[in-house]
Structures are given as C-alpha cells and as structure tokens.
C-alpha cells in the first residue's frame, strides 16, 4: 500500500521555514523561506500540535511589509535570494517595516531613491549617459539640474563626476537619475569639483559609514578639514587641504571595514599625534 507524504511547511531549499523575527541579524542563505509575524502558528512553524480556533480569522489584519534587496515576496512568506545578514527597520507609522539582506557585494544594483556618484561617459542630444556601476549606464536629462532651461544649459562635460538620485530603477527600464529634489532644489547634488579623489569600496562599508550610530566620519573630521561625498553605489569622493591628507583619509576609510573599534581608535590617535 503506497504511503502518501504531506509536503508541510517546507522551503524550496528543503529546510523548514523559520519565523522572520528569530533570524534577525543572522546569516540567511538563498532558497530559505521566512514566515512573517502575522502568519506564524502559536505552536511554532509547522508544529504538530493543534492550532487554536480563531473566531475572527476572517477579519485578521495583514501587515504591510516592504521587501528590500535580497528578498522576494512569495505568497505569505519571504524568499531569500542573496546570502547575508537579515536586517529589519521599524516602521515610522503602521505596518511591518522593511526587511532586507545585508550582503558583502561590490556589484551595485540601482535602487529607486539611492543617492549615487556617477561618471559622465557620453552625451547624446539632451541626455547624458552616466556610469553608476550597474549593468547599464543611467540617463540624466540636462533639465534635471537646478535652474536649467533650454537656453540655460548646465555645464556638464564627459568625464565629470555627478552626484544625483535614482528616480527610475527596475529590471525592465534603464536607470534614470536627477540632480534635483522634489522641490526643484539641488540640495547638494550636481557636478562634483574637479579636485579630490574618487575611490570605490564595498556596499557594506558604505551602509556602515552612513549609519546614524557611525562615528568614523566625525573622527576623521577632527583630524583634517575635509569634503566628502558618499554614493550608495560604493563610490566615495574625498578632498582635503593637501594631497597627502587626501590619500591618508582614503586609506583610513578603506581600512575601517576590517578594523575593530579599538584598532580604529589607535589609528586615529597615531594620526592625531603626527
């Protein structure tokens, strides 16, 4: 007599789906399935016990959850598509917040709303082609600058560095960026100065440097007066008074990714003495 096996709450990778709150800040692998809080059983995921009867099951509210990089919505679960640490940002209002996978990758995938540093590689008609480190260049209109009109065109040349924001980023269209905010103001965006040094770091280091609790930039500002621009595409532009100070700042920023807090304090103390 043939035995019928039930599939149960198993993930694509063959392992049991886990509750999303139990794996926060832990390493997740591609193929794992994560169950959102509003879909968990009282007994645990896939428990063998009987589930309690819910009289208001039909009126149960669904949490609004935003899937960031490395995650994909699969029914009532989240499917992991990248290896890394699972992160969560609490919502400002109602909802379940934002979940994403923090991975150590160098290849940038454009995301809507990201502020990036690009390099103008071509000019065709009224459109600039800007290299942002993705699979294809982004398009930038000459009208996407503060105060730009058909008569008053911005002075942008091939090879210039552009700091702007991605406004279109999906798999079916080429990326599009602008150098103005929603009010039409530059707000720090536009062509970056000719002097300074541009170098590339990992995307994880960029997120670390831009975190609210990161003190690295403040500590660097105490060493030398500097100008610095961070791009979410892994590019950093820095400028100090002298070339030597600029190179020191770039080397320290690159090394901070693999330093502990104590090692970083020792390096800053040595630089302050010299």
UniProtKB/Swiss-Prot annotation:
Main localization category: cytoplasm
GO biological process terms held by the UniProt record: CUT catabolic process; DNA deamination; isotype switching; mRNA catabolic process; positive regulation of isotype switching; RNA catabolic process; RNA processing; rRNA processing
Crosslink site: Glycyl lysine isopeptide (Lys-Gly) (interchain with G-Cter in SUMO2): 150
SUPFAM superfamilies named in the record: Eukaryotic type KH-domain (KH-domain type I), Nucleic acid-binding proteins, Ribosomal L27 protein-like
Keyword Nuclease found: yes
Enzyme class per UniProt: hydrolase
Identification of the protein by name: Exosome complex component RRP40
Organism from which the protein derives: Mus musculus
Gene name for this UniProt entry: Exosc3
